């Protein structure tokens, strides 16, 4: 089986996932050497059931299949999908390749099962590891049995954060990637994978009502969803980069104008997306970043 990039997605992030998938192939010197696969929550019935709850930060919270980030359990599915063989990269749908993912697949894993970018200080943790991008040696992750994990998650046998933050893994099996392989809202000539991780400023969402859950009580979350709006991203180059990729997808027919219109009508992407496609068609990220 070829090395595979797995991109998590749900209804709210499916267009972002398509843009992400395009970026990996587009910016690789050898795009036929690996596969790209989108993992959509709708194909996993247990993730679509709202009548269940999880432990999250020590508190019981209702599971919301419609949340912006309901795909995150799928970070732990790729080894099983690969038959516990070979290498996989798993990413969130708001991660876009500027560099060549083949470089990541080709690196010496030094016996480690998991490689990811450290993010010291995030969530008040000096040892935080970002699982939004992971390079995996699937042969060393046979304990990642996805159905068993979902049993444990929805059965409150472990805390969501302990799982998603890799606290249940042996730290000796985790290697640390360079920051450019999960560049958090930073686009520079060194960036390999751009991650538009600040949900409030995702470039394709500007002006829309927020559709994600904060770590607060449900009345506060409901009020936030009613009142809060996505803000413009502070770096216009990131907006340009993402919409230039979407323009290529539209021009190739992989994404239709009608699909973009449906996503706009559903408030999954900003309502001026067609104008931005025209504005940024042909925009060259490397030239812009070198200027």
Language-model features, listed with the residues they occupy:
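Short, acidic, metal-binding catalytic loop of nucleotide-sugar glycosyltransferases
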Residues: 23-32
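Residues that flank catalytic or metal-binding motifs in active/ligand-binding sites
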Residues: 32, 75, 91, 129-132, ...
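A glycosyltransferase accessory/donor-loop signature
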Residues: 1-3, 9-12, 18, 36-38, ...
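Active-site-proximal specificity loops/subdomain of glycosyltransferases
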Residues: 33-81
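Conserved catalytic core of nucleotide-sugar-dependent glycosyltransferases
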Residues: 106-165
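GT-A fold catalytic core of metal-dependent nucleotide-sugar glycosyltransferases
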Residues: 74-119, 126, 135-138
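Conserved hydrophobic/aromatic beta-strand scaffold that supports enzyme active sites
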Residues: 78, 114, 131-135, 174-176, ...
């Amino acid at each position: 089986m070829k090395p595979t990039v797995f991109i998590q997605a749900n209804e709210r992030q499916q267009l972002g996932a398509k843009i992400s998938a395009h970026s990996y192939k587009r910016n690789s010197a050898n795009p036929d050497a690996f596969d790209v696969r989108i993992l959509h929550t709708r194909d996993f019935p247990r993730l679509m059931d709202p009548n269940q709850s999880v432990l999250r930060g020590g508190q019981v919270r209702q599971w919301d299949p419609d949340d912006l980030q309901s795909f995150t359990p799928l970070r732990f599915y790729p080894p099983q999908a690969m038959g516990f063989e070979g290498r996989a990269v798993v990413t969130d749908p708001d991660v876009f390749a500027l560099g060549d993912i083949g470089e990541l697949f080709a690196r010496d894993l030094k016996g480690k099962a998991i490689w990811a970018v450290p993010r010291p200080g995030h969530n008040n943790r000096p040892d935080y590891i970002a699982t939004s991008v992971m390079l995996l040696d699937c042969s060393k992750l046979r304990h990642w049995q996805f159905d068993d994990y979902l049993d444990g998650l929805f059965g409150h046998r472990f805390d969501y954060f302990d799982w998603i933050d890799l606290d249940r893994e042996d730290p000796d099996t985790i290697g640390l990637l360079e920051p450019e392989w999960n560049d958090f809202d930073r686009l520079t000539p060194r960036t390999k994978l751009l991650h538009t991780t600040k949900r409030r400023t995702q470039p394709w969402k500007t002006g829309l009502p927020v559709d994600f859950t904060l770590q607060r009580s449900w009345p506060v979350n409901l009020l936030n969803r009613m009142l809060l709006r996505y803000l413009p991203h502070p770096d216009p180059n990131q907006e340009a980069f993402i919409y230039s990729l979407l323009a290529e997808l539209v021009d190739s027919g992989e994404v239709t104008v009608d699909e973009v219109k449906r996503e706009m009508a559903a408030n999954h992407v900003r309502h001026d997306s067609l104008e931005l496609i025209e504005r940024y068609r042909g925009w060259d990220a490397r030239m812009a970043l070198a200027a």
